[in-house]
Design a protein with these regions (language model features):
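Primarily membrane-embedded glycan-assembly and transfer machineries that use lipid-linked glycans
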Residues: 1-137, 141, 145, 172-282, ...
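Transmembrane helices and adjacent periplasmic/lumenal helix-loop junctions
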Residues: 149-170, 273-281
């Protein structure tokens, strides 16, 4: 009905409203369904911090899982102290942003995909990571060094955002790459000084050790052939595979789109070529794909404009102040 009305009266934005409402309803219906131990780990770290302890040192004898996230995650979840609900809000914000932009294919995919719906409130924290990554990639297209800095900051939430730094080096040069490292150091260095680098590394190792069986990974696929797999072997393999992917793809990157795609490939190989992984790691890639898919695959000028086109006005203002740059070895900040 909304589609017929939009065709008859040129109210195409009704389709955006329908998709947005469907996305909200699906997420609301699934709220609290599913389980992730991420909220337990985050709350445990926040409780430790509130009591004057170290978020990267678990309480002896406690059943709370280790906290294998960056210091930005501590700051991000501290005010609400409710990671599940906070991630649900972020998921709604991402849906709102896509609807406001008006690209129908990306909005439809994000609003209705079972992956994004089911993981909006299961407790995993990859929606926040996805939004941080998307913002950084959008800034990167206009201000490479600032965007790379934001990539580094995103890596202080979840370290896997660093997957985009190798292609950034070959696209925008050493200055942008250094900005990315500086962004990562901005919070990781103080955290290492305050809470101890050895404690942080030990927490990451303890989090890996929790997973006793391969899951959603290359190791699981191999184990289905009745070949014995060991965690240590595949943990090393995924690092080698990720580094190899970066070395093979990054030197050929010459466009912003190339940075996005190469980073996604490095990210995917590094996270899924190991012993254990999770569907939640696909959320950042999915949000990035949903943002760019209409421009990449659809016919030109498919964006649906809201009355007065506020997104278009914002885009025009941004283009005048920060035009897109898309050439290899960019020297601009």
């Amino acid at each position: 009905m909304a589609t017929l009305l939009s065709l008859r009266f040129r109210l195409s934005w009704l389709a955006l409203i329908v998709l947005f409402v469907v996305g909200l309803e699906l997420r609301y219906a699934q709220f609290g369904v599913g389980f992730s131990d991420v909220p337990l780990a985050i709350r445990g770290a926040l409780d430790q911090l509130a009591s004057g302890g170290n978020p990267y040192v678990p309480v002896p004898g406690s059943s709370i899982p280790p906290f294998p996230y960056g210091p930005f995650a501590v700051l991000w979840y501290l005010p609400m102290h409710d990671p599940r609900f906070q991630e649900f809000i972020v998921a709604i914000m991402a849906t709102t942003l896509l609807a406001f932009r008006g690209e129908p294919m990306g909005l439809a995919l994000w609003a209705t995909a079972p992956l994004t719906v089911n993981l909006a409130s299961d407790g995993s924290n990859d929606h926040t990571a996805a939004v941080l990554l998307l913002v950084a990639l959008l800034v990167l297209e206009r201000a490479p060094r600032a965007g790379a800095l934001l990539i580094g900051i995103a890596a202080t939430f979840k370290i896997y955002a660093l997957a985009w730094l190798p292609p950034i080096f070959f696209w925008a040069g050493a200055g942008a790459f250094a900005a990315g490292l500086a962004g990562a150091a901005l919070l990781w260095v103080p955290a290492a000084i305050l809470w101890g680098a050895s404690n942080i590394f030990a927490t990451f190792q303890a989090a890996d050790a929790v997973h006793k069986t391969p899951y959603f990974s290359l190791a699981e696929a191999v184990s289905r052939t009745r070949v014995h797999v060991t965690q240590s072997t595949f943990d090393i393999l995924r690092l080698i595979a990720g580094a190899t992917t970066a070395a093979v793809l990054s030197p050929f990157v010459r466009t912003h789109r190339g940075v996005v795609v190469a980073g996604m490939a490095i990210y995917f190989v590094t996270l899924y070529a190991g012993f254990w992984s999770t569907p939640a790691y696909l959320i950042p890639i999915t949000l990035v794909v949903c943002w760019f898919i209409d421009d990449a695959l659809g016919p030109p000028l498919t964006r649906i404009r809201w009355p007065s086109d506020p997104f278009g006005l914002i885009t025009e203002a941004v283009n005048r102040r920060w035009p897109k740059v898309d050439a290899a070895r960019i020297g601009a900040p």
